[in-house]
């Protein structure tokens, strides 16, 4: 045991995973960190394995994926693990962010942790988009065309940027090559950001807790208590992931991507993966191209303003009934945006999308500050009595 505390590298591991003092009352909602680390590990291992058999060429990309599925030993398993763990990764990240919003994890002194977390989300979305293009099915090609074309909304230099990204005048061999290179690189950038995220949390005050108060009143070491607690959710995660991988591997994908990319034929609807749908819905809700692109990026960056706009004296919404209602309305609205992103651009959905988009931004910039001020006033009134 002594080497764990004296060895220059092992003592860092010891301070994070063995002796790290955690508040004794943290619930299972604090288990997402370990699950997300596991997801990233699975993605890197399966991704590197897939890269060994993949060919980033317009002519061979689709066939190389079929070769992985049919000819490589357990290639189908590696590919389905990679695609379904990507969905699990985003599902858990959204729950992790939801936990952070509910329990006020963005408030000082954890603002840096929250900011790095938001950057992690953006890098994840970029990585997922790049990866979706690689199988080079119909959705891959047209998704790449639509999303890269968003850059053309930038005044004056937009079209030049698009052609610079493509490496030509349309999505071609150069595009696929650079997307593959970047898709391979970004998970390692993500791993570095995750370490920064952990350092930012560990070197301030550590984890929060469901009461939103200081955790110093009662703490327990990470091992063995929280290691076993994390293992419970890790086993549940593997069971659920296995159900998807072995019984319904394509449930979360799009059948259009099993059609080889054809630049001469547009698919009936160009839809991204489910985890990017809310932001795609916000993009489509605004008729102006440039404003739509700005709104889509602002929707992600809006998370960054939470430490500023939440003016409440209490951490989290667990003891604030009005904020609790606002939080659940926000969650419902996010799920509605997810549905609308998958629909055709036609009459009821356009209006619903616009209302939901307004409500989404109103939550961050209007509802949260107003409701927190009302609750502060109510708290002051009751304490004066």
From Swiss-Prot:
Residues involved in heme b b562 binding: 82, 183
Signal recorded as keyword: no
Sequence positions that bind a ubiquinone: 202
Location(s), subcellular: Mitochondrion inner membrane
One GO molecular-function entry: metal ion binding
Transmembrane segments: 32-52, 76-98, 113-133, 179-199, 226-246, 290-310, 322-342, 349-369
Keyword Chaperone: no
Cofactor entry: heme b
Any one GO cellular component localisation term in the record: respiratory chain complex III
Predominant subcellular localization, coarse grouping: mitochondrion
Keywords: Electron transport, Heme, Iron, Membrane, Metal-binding, Mitochondrion, Mitochondrion inner membrane, Respiratory chain, Transmembrane, Transmembrane helix, Transport, Ubiquinone
Membrane topology according to the record: Multi-pass membrane protein
Cofactor binding summary note: Binds 2 heme b groups non-covalently.
Binding locations of heme b b566: 96, 197
Pfam families for this protein: Cytochrom_B_C (PF00032), Cytochrome_B (PF00033)
InterPro entries noted in UniProt: Cyt_b/b6_C, Cyt_b/b6_C_sf, Cyt_b/b6_N, Cytb/b6-like_sf, Cytochrome_b, Cytochrome_b_C_euk/bac, Cytochrome_b_N_euk/bac, Di-haem_cyt_TM
Single Gene Ontology BP annotation: mitochondrial electron transport, ubiquinol to cytochrome c
Domain of life: Eukaryota
Function: Component of the ubiquinol-cytochrome c reductase complex (complex III or cytochrome b-c1 complex) that is part of the mitochondrial respiratory chain. The b-c1 complex mediates electron transfer from ubiquinol to cytochrome c. Contributes to the generation of a proton gradient across the mitochondrial membrane that is then used for ATP synthesis.
Assembly description: Fungal cytochrome b-c1 complex contains 10 subunits; 3 respiratory subunits, 2 core proteins and 5 low-molecular weight proteins. Cytochrome b-c1 complex is a homodimer.
Family, per entry: Belongs to the cytochrome b family.
General remark: Heme 1 (or BL or b562) is low-potential and absorbs at about 562 nm, and heme 2 (or BH or b566) is high-potential and absorbs at about 566 nm.
Protein name in the entry: Cytochrome b
Species the sequence originates in: Aspergillus terreus (strain NIH 2624 / FGSC A1156)
Gene (UniProt): cob
């Amino acid at each position: 045991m002594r080497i764990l505390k004296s060895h220059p590298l092992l003592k860092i591991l010891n301070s994070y995973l063995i002796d790290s003092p955690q508040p004794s009352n943290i619930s299972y909602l604090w288990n997402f960190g370990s699950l997300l680390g596991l997801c990233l590990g699975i993605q890197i291992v399966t991704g590197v394995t897939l890269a060994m058999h993949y060919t980033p060429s317009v002519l061979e990309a689709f066939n190389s994926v079929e070769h992985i599925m049919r000819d490589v030993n357990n290639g189908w398993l590696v590919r389905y693990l990679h695609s379904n763990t990507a969905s699990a990764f985003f599902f858990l990240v959204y729950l992790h962010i939801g936990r952070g919003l509910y329990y006020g994890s963005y408030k000082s002194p954890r603002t840096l942790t929250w900011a790095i977390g938001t950057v992690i989300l953006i890098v994840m979305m970029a990585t997922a988009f790049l990866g979706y293009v690689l199988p080079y099915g119909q959705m891959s090609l047209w998704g790449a065309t639509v999303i890269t074309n968003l850059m053309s909304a930038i005044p004056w230099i937009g079209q030049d940027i698009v052609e610079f990204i493509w490496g030509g005048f349309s999505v071609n061999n150069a595009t696929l090559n650079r997307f593959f290179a970047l898709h391979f690189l970004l998970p390692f950038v993500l791993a570095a950001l995750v370490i920064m995220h952990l350092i930012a949390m560990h070197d301030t005050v550590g984890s929060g807790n469901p009461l939103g108060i200081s955790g110093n009143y009662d703490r327990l070491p990470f091992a063995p208590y929280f290691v076993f607690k994390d293992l419970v959710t890790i086993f549940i995660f593997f069971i659920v992931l296995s159900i998807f991988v072995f019984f319904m591997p394509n449930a979360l994908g799009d059948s259009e991507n099993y059609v080889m990319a054809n630049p001469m034929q547009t698919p009936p609807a160009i839809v991204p993966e489910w985890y990017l749908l809310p932001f795609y819905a916000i993009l489509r809700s605004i008729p102006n191209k440039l404003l739509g692109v700005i709104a889509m990026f602002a929707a992600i960056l809006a998370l960054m303003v939470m430490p500023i706009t939440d003016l409440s004296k209490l951490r989290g919404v667990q003891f604030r009934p009005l904020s609790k209602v606002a939080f659940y309305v926000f969650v419902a609205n996010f799920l509605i945006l997810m549905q609308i992103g998958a629909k055709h651009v036609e009459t009821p959905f356009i209006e619903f999308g616009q209302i939901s988009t307004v409500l989404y931004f109103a939550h961050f910039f209007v509802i949260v500050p107003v409701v927190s001020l009302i609750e502060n006033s109510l708290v002051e009134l009751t304490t004066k009595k």
